[in-house]
Amino acid sequence: MRHADEGARIFRICNACRYCEGFCAVYPAMERRTAFPPGELHYLANLCHNCGECYYACQYAPPHEFAVNVPQLLAKIRLESYEQFAWPRWLARAYRRNGLVVAVLLAACIAALLVAAPRDFYAATGLFAAAAGYVVIALSVGAVRFWRIAGTSQSIPAKAAMAGLKDALTLRYLASGRILSRRLFHHLTFYGFLLCFASTSVAAFCHHLLHRDAPYPLLSAPVLLGTAGGAGLLVGTAGLLVLKLRRDSAIKDEAQTGMDLGFIALLFLTSLTGLALLMQRKTQMMPAILAVHLGSVLALFLTLPCGKFVHGIYRAAALLRNSIELR
């Protein structure tokens, strides 16, 4: 682990000071420890919601000689988590180095292939099924790897599991901070994504079990869910992009910029083309828009286990461990 020594040094200082113990879940969790091996650093880094408040409150932050910068340190450790626990690991490293370029090129190439192929909406079903299987396996492997290193061997009480799930779904530790809109945009993005997934699932049910082919009526469940989810994703990702570009450079890890922008760009493009497809589904533009949309969705799927999406899974796991410790 590249930042193990620096992490242990900074947390020893923070453990002696404890001025920030009321800011979030990280500092009470830190106070329950006297040593900080790599597994504990992975846990604390993913428990952090990156609000940055501790940096502005810290009397030992740069230019002090102690140079305590917890937000930046934990951001760097989180990136190590993404790489260390990803499967396959080589793809995670490649995506980290040029995330935006990889994401855009992948979407463009897949869209071009789909345009060149026979224009049958259902021709790509097998391809998407294979991609979905890969995503489920890769994310599951990553979650298991993370829990083995940064989790706990204690049993998981039902109350602790429910509390951890609630903290994750409500973004409890994004409720404070100088930019409250960050929590709102995260909610719009996360729940927009879930609504789009629900729309796809309902559409699959209608097609395979009810034998109803797309396009579906405007007031049908797939269209309503997809429209609401797409709008949420569009606004949420645009807001997160603005906040990302405005974020104080002193507390962010520049090495993650490509990965972050790649993920945001794919989410935004997926929602934008999905809404455009709805509006143009009875025009001659529909096949081209459909190809771009399917290309964006497939590119998003293929990069989910190797990019910023995994931060939600590891953070939920860290919140679960925190809930177990509190009980």
Question: Model features per residue range: what roles?
Answer:
Residues 16, 40-51, 227-230, 257-264:
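Secondary-structure capping and boundary motifs in well-ordered enzyme cores
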